[in-house]
Amino acid sequence: MKFFIDTADVGEIKKALALGLCDGVTTNPSLVAKTGRGFEDVLKEIVQLVPGPISAEVTATDYEGMLREGRHYAKFGSQVVIKVPLTVDGLRAVKTLTDEGTKVNVTLCFSPVQALLAAKAGATYISPFVGRLDDISQDGMAMVADIVQIYRNYGFKTQVLVASVRHPVHVLEAAKLGADVATIPYSVIEQLAKHPLTDAGLKKFLADWEKVPKAPK
């Protein structure tokens, strides 16, 4: 399973790259707003850093606007993937952009049937939002399981990109279900590396090492 980092913070991207845990990047307007920078400046910098897929989200909600923004952002680099919402106009934009050779990530997916439509339209990625479904007492990972099964049933090439990841269990379940990608906040990447028994074991090893006779200097 590939790891994308879900951020527009260049510092976090650099840290994930140094760990070998950044196969790609996903951004959205909310993440860009947190940086206090203009989106195009951020995108240009990310393109210089990351060789893998970089999702750049349109803010237009109409078909023509999505095409205009998508075509513009696609010029920033061959690794740029245009991110569009799962709406009727969004699906239409997916079809057009895909026919033009542009990769598309369909975002804000909350049902397996929506994911089926995105695959039929030719999406490169589908982004089911597991955390937001969990927030309203629905089962986000059950949605992912259904999407993975449907795509396998019919041989769709669209990759399942699990989004709205809130904690390590989401990552674990995505991997168990066979999702292609999980896009993960840097804070969750750090949590993945942590375990209390690892900390306790390291503390014990270091304490025991202090008891080992040392050669005179």
UniProtKB/Swiss-Prot annotation:
- Which keywords label this protein? Cytoplasm, Pentose shunt, Schiff base, Transferase
Q: Which CDD domains match?
A: Transaldolase_FSA (cd00956)
Q: Which reaction does it catalyse?
A: D-sedoheptulose 7-phosphate + D-glyceraldehyde 3-phosphate = D-erythrose 4-phosphate + beta-D-fructose 6-phosphate
Stored SUPFAM superfamilies: Aldolase
Record GO biological process: carbohydrate metabolic process; pentose-phosphate shunt
Does Transferase appear among the keywords? Answer: yes
Q: Which residues form the active site?
A: 83
In terms of Gene3D superfamilies, this protein maps to: Aldolase class I
Q: Which Gene Ontology terms of cellular component type are present?
A: cytoplasm
Pathway stated in the Swiss-Prot or TrEMBL entry: Carbohydrate degradation; pentose phosphate pathway; D-glyceraldehyde 3-phosphate and beta-D-fructose 6-phosphate from D-ribose 5-phosphate and D-xylulose 5-phosphate (non-oxidative stage): step 2/3
Which compartments is it annotated to reside in?
Cytoplasm
Which PANTHER family does UniProt cross-reference here?
A: FRUCTOSE-6-PHOSPHATE ALDOLASE 1-RELATED, TRANSALDOLASE
Role noted for this protein: Transaldolase is important for the balance of metabolites in the pentose-phosphate pathway.
NCBIfam families per UniProt: fsa_talC_mipB
Protein's recorded name: Probable transaldolase
**Species of origin:** Anaeromyxobacter sp. (strain K)
Native organism taxonomy = Bacteria, Pseudomonadati, Myxococcota, Myxococcia, Myxococcales
